[in-house]
Amino acid sequence: MRELLQRLGSDVVGRHRELELVVAALGADRHILLEGPPGTGKSTLLRAVARELGIGFEFVEGNAELTPARLVGHFDPARVLTDGYSPDIFEDGPLTAALREGSLLYVEEINRIPEETLNVLITVMSERELNVPRLGRIPAAHGFRLVAAMNPFDAIGTARISSAVYDRVCRLAVDYQAPEEEEAIVARAVDG
């Protein structure tokens, strides 16, 4: 683990404790919720971890328009009319793709998504599978984890998260970095 953290340290400025906790939670097969204000490097940290671990990364932007169908996927309507319902005409959404591939599903701003969409995620976190009408059961492949991020509740457009979510995740607070780390981030962005 020490070697992995050293490699991650070359991709992510600071955040040593957060990297250690995220890697430990993933190693323990746990889902993760990162809580903190915008611009604190939550997405950057997770992309680096997925890349170093060789795990797929499915990104979902959480907003009021994220329906269960957009998250799960759907049958191609034109092909349903000609061929009927068949597994080969189902178009995977990011959740289904992550389940099948054993990837990380990263839901940004989870506290902005509708309750019915959140309920789909709660079921998948608990059961480690998804049941899709006319398609059947999709079990989570080894490596699948939900990693979500959220801004503080008082941010505009956010909602409180159900305790059912909190019961199923490791929570990690992420705050702004020290001034010298922020300067290093800017220097890296300008140089690279």
Outline where the language-model segments fall.
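AAA+ P-loop NTPase catalytic core and its hallmark functional loops
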Residues: 1-192
